[in-house]
């Protein structure tokens, strides 16, 4: 049985982290060995990069291109140290964010050069793409309200303007339209149970082929 790479994507507060955990529990109950990881922060080096990237904007401002390069560095380390070796061992990996986040946030959100972003993604991933990406689609105001309700303070990205987050959301919509077989949209504003069931229904046919 070969390894599989499933990514969860979406704007802030879309519920992807909770849904990824529920998905992992479901797969484990089916007897599948699962690894949960995230970007940024999927390695020891990545933990340090995550702290730099998400600290509040007023603490230490980060230039937009610097931000892009730090995300690429995190991804390169993650792919080399964790993703490729674990997939080669036949593991199922569930990842909270991957290359589509960079396209949506730094490409659409920051309006950085898409050719540069694709080049950096190609270098960082070495061609590794997800088998399936679950895009949890929620209205940006709903997602940010959820984050504020957590009472833990907003990080540097979450503090961005509504206009920024709307551009990110449009980026995800465009990505899903251009890669419909890889990126599957799920309505993230439905109940947690309904979203989880929908994800099960999406993945079940693939599991029959993979197992």
UniProtKB/Swiss-Prot annotation:
InterPro entries: P-loop_NTPase, Thymidylate_kin-like_dom, Thymidylate_kin_CS, Thymidylate_kinase
Reaction catalysis annotation: dTMP + ATP = dTDP + ADP
Biological process according to GO: dTDP biosynthetic process; dTTP biosynthetic process; dUDP biosynthetic process
Any one GO molecular function term: ATP binding
PROSITE patterns to which the protein is assigned, alphabetical: THYMIDYLATE_KINASE
TM region positions: none
Binding residues for ATP: 10-17
EC code(s) of this entry: 2.7.4.9
CC annotations in GO: cytosol
Keywords: ATP-binding, Kinase, Nucleotide biosynthesis, Nucleotide-binding, Transferase
Record's function text: Phosphorylation of dTMP to form dTDP in both de novo and salvage pathways of dTTP synthesis.
Alphabetical list of PANTHER family matching this protein: THYMIDYLATE KINASE, UMP-CMP KINASE 2, MITOCHONDRIAL
Record-stated family: Belongs to the thymidylate kinase family.
Protein name: Thymidylate kinase
The organism of origin for this protein: Trichormus variabilis (strain ATCC 29413 / PCC 7937)
UniProt lineage: Bacteria, Bacillati, Cyanobacteriota, Cyanophyceae, Nostocales
């Amino acid at each position: 049985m070969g390894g599989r790479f499933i990514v969860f994507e979406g704007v802030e507060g879309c519920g992807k982290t909770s849904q990824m955990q529920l998905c992992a529990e479901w797969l484990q109950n089916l007897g599948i060995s699962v690894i949960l990881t995230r970007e940024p922060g999927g390695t020891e080096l990545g933990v340090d990069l995550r702290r730099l990237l998400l600290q509040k904007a007023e603490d230490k401002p980060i230039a937009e291109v610097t931000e892009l390069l730090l995300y690429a560095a995190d991804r390169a380390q993650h792919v080399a140290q964790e993703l490729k070796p674990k997939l080669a061992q036949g593991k199922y990996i569930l990842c909270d964010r991957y290359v589509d986040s960079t396209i949506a946030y730094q490409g659409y959100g920051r309006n950085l050069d898409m050719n540069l972003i694709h080049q950096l993604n190609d270098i960082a991933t070495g061609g590794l793409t997800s088998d399936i990406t679950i895009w949890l689609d929620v209205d940006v105001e709903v997602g940010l309200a959820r984050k504020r309700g957590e009472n833990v303070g907003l990080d540097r990205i979450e503090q961005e303007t509504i206009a920024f987050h709307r551009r990110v959301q449009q980026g995800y919509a465009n990505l899903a339209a251009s890669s419909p077989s890889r990126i599957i949209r799920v309505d993230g504003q439905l109940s947690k149970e309904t979203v989880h069931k929908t994800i099960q229904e999406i993945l079940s046919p693939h599991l029959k082929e993979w197992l």
